[in-house]
Amino acid sequence: MSVEQHRKEAPKTVRCMILTISDTRTYDTDKSGALIRELLEAKGHQVTEYQIVKDEYSQIQHWLKVAAGRADIDAILLNGGTGIALRDTTYEAVRDSLDKEMPGFGEIFRLLSFQEDIGTAAILSRAIAGVRDGKAIFSMPGSTGAVKLAMTRIIIPELGHVMREILKDR
């Protein structure tokens, strides 16, 4: 079956949790979380939960576990904490929670970042995606430019298709 056929069979609405990983952002100042919500809802997806989470491994793991156990969440979208600073723990928390990794997400994100946005600074990004307990997980940097790139060029175009693949054998 072709990719186009898969996309035709994919769910049109995906129920999403947004997690902004930050020690400083608030609901009033979180432009990236707001942008994720706006882009998802513009394409007919639902945001069922939105949280700002401290950039601490245990806190991120906690929210991934909560989301994995909820029937009203299909996908988890994280932004922030993907760099190489000591406090950046999102990559490790997500990686350690995945049943299956989708390495192509990070690879394509860094390629597009290099080509269209930040040049060689793309090597600092540790964007990651995968599957846990039947939920798609996408983790991207926290800048609005990175969020827009990841959402419009990768996540939104493939979200339904990813969910179709996750759910087809269940």
From Swiss-Prot:
It comes from the Bacteria. Pathway: Cofactor biosynthesis; molybdopterin biosynthesis. InterPro entries: MoaB, MoaB/Mog-like_dom_sf, MoaB/Mog_dom, MoCF_biosynth_CS. Keywords: Molybdenum cofactor biosynthesis. SUPFAM superfamilies: Molybdenum cofactor biosynthesis proteins. GO terms for cellular component: cytosol. Pfam families: MoCF_biosynth. One of its GO terms (biological process) is Mo-molybdopterin cofactor biosynthetic process. Belongs to the MoaB/Mog family. May be involved in the biosynthesis of molybdopterin. This is Molybdenum cofactor biosynthesis protein B. It comes from Halalkalibacterium halodurans (strain ATCC BAA-125 / DSM 18197 / FERM 7344 / JCM 9153 / C-125) (Bacillus halodurans).
